[in-house]
Amino acid sequence: RQRQMCIRDRCLTASGEIKTLKKENMQLGYRSSVFKNGGLIIISLTLALKKGDKTEIKTEMDGLLNRRKQKQPLEYPSAGSTFKRPEGYFAGALIEKNGLKGSAVGGAQVSEKHAGFVINRGGATAADVKALIGKIQKKVFENDGVMLEPEVIFKGRNGD
């Protein structure tokens, strides 16, 4: 849906230049775009929205929020979904199948609510999160032959 709604955006380049991109130049795909690795920061966005019934829209929004609250560990800080969905599998199901739900490194923990999320249960460092991701990848690959690809991107001193 989002790909169809976005018309253009203004973004900031690494050199400080403001640039306008049209939808066709954003390379929008499944959990990917020029913004993910391109050094661009979105500063404004133009969307094409359809008019709709306010009550229906509110009902749909409330339903989506309730489903997220039930399935995702929104009560803890996290970077969202930790791994991309491997073709033919669900990352969370593979992680759970391998007995990793609830496992932790330092303050980073595989969520008990949804194994596809690494949460910060208090004091987690980037090193904790990276170590836990590595532990998950190793065990899932050893047991299932599936290499989970992180969706999380590390930036900064410890980002490598």
Give residue spans per PLM region.
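Short, small-residue-biased leader/transition segments that mark boundaries at the very start
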Residues: Q2-I7
